[in-house]
């Protein structure tokens, strides 16, 4: 127990030493909760992803948050089946899902948690569709760093597949993803092949996160099969730059600055950190009309692609099948996506409003941390615990 006048305390458990968006939002919430005056103990969830930040790219501040604090709750950034029971402390799980409904096992595990927090209304609805009690789930959007990601940042120097500098192309379309079925990278490249020609002054930049040589081999096998089925090759379209380069966090603003547009053809998103970073950087946006995108995008700030629900197909990806079996996700309309690309390449995609201004007004990290603090304070009060 502690005196009521002491500052709030919280234990956070989540992966924070890696390169994933999950690691990023664990770090940002920790950073901004601390700035709100909350004393933190940070415990790493080391098994979230194999790829970690190099030692010299890690902020040593996070490594200092190991001392115990007199917390009454543990906030765990992970999937529900990865939550570790916290004894007498309140158990809070911040998680997200990209298809409907969430797995039945998640709902069963979630019933043992004191609170589930998700970033978007779409994730909340997916939990409710699975039968989760509505009074045990709250929504707290993630944030965007509009100071670090902004117009005017010097672009990274990148070269296209033929050696021409990326900066020489008038239209530079970026996609950042880990190639898995939900991200629909094969569909994205297929749409590029059908929408563009070598005469277009445009390039597609695909920043890949490949965890192994086998993953790379499988991706390019699937791309080769797609080209064979389509009857059209990469050589018959505007150039595509695939890069698996490991960018330090300090380099990421320059990567966005190297692009003019950001494009996703994802089948479902819990948030899509790269899309929000691209919006903060001032890029023009093309996104499917579904899930998390509808939290911070609309027709005024982006080209939105119509999408239809379909059964989630995770063929050949056992780990994804375990999550998405029995769920539905979205199939973006590739013809509409091709038309959106043509609007971008032909210069007919001027947005009516600024996505960056929208993020700066409503979706910054200080705002996200303040919302989360309020949710946690309410939970402690409901259970008669000091925060």
State where each predicted segment sits.
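Acidic anion/phosphate-binding donor-loop and adjacent secondary structure
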Residues: 104-105, 144-164
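N-terminal pre-catalytic "stem/leader" segment of glycosyltransferase-like enzymes
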Residues: 1-70, 387
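Conserved donor-binding/catalytic core segment of Leloir-type glycosyltransferases
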Residues: 11, 162-183, 189-192, 204-206
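Nucleotide-activated donor-binding/catalytic signature segment of Leloir-type glycosyltransferases, i.e.
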Residues: 212-246, 250
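A charged, aromatic-enriched C-terminal amphipathic alpha-helix characteristic of glycosyltransferases
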Residues: 328-336, 345-376
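Extended catalytic core of nucleotide-activated donor transferases of GT-like folds
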Residues: 11-13, 44-131
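Short hydrophobic beta-strand element within catalytic cores of glycosyltransferases
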Residues: 275, 284-287, 301-305
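Aromatic "clamp/platform" in nucleotide-sugar-dependent glycosyltransferases that forms part
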Residues: 267
């Amino acid at each position: 127990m502690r005196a009521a006048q002491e500052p709030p305390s919280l234990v956070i458990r989540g992966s924070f030493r890696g390169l994933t968006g999950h690691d990023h939002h664990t770090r940002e919430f920790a950073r901004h909760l601390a700035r709100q005056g909350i004393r933190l103990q940070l415990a790493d969830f080391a098994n979230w992803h194999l790829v970690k930040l190099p030692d010299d790219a890690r902020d040593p501040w996070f490594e200092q948050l190991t001392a115990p604090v007199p917390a009454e709750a543990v906030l765990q950034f992970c999937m529900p089946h990865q939550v570790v029971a916290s004894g007498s402390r309140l158990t809070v799980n911040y998680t997200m899902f990209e298809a409907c409904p969430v797995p039945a096992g998640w709902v069963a595990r979630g019933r043992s948690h004191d609170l589930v927090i998700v970033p978007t209304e779409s994730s909340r609805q997916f939990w409710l569709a699975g039968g989760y009690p509505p009074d045990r789930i709250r929504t707290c959007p993630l944030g965007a760093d509009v100071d670090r990601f902004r117009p005017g940042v010097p672009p990274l120097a990148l070269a296209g597949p033929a050696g021409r500098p990326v900066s020489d192309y008038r239209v530079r379309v970026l996609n950042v993803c880990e190639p898995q079925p939900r991200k629909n990278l094969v569909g994205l490249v297929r749409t590029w092949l059908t929408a563009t020609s070598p005469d277009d002054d445009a390039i597609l930049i695909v920043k890949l996160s490949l965890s192994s040589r086998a993953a790379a081999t499988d991706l390019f096998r699937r791309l080769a099969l797609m080209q064979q089925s389509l009857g059209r090759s990469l050589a018959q379209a505007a150039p595509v730059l695939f890069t698996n380069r490991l960018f330090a966090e300090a380099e990421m603003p320059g990567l966005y600055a190297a692009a003019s547009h950001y494009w996703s053809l994802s089948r479902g998103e819990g948030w899509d950190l790269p899309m929000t970073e691209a919006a903060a950087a001032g890029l023009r946006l093309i996104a499917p009309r579904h899930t998390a995108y509808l939290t911070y995008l609309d027709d005024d700030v982006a080209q939105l692609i119509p999408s239809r629900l379909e059964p989630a197909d995770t063929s050949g990806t056992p780990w994804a099948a375990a999550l998405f079996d029995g769920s539905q996700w979205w199939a973006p309309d590739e013809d509409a996506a091709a038309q959106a690309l043509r609007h971008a390449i032909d210069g007919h995609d001027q947005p009516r409003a600024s996505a960056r201004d929208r993020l700066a007004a409503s979706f910054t990290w200080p705002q996200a941390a303040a919302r989360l603090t309020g949710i946690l304070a309410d939970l402690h009060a409901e259970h008669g615990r000091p925060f």
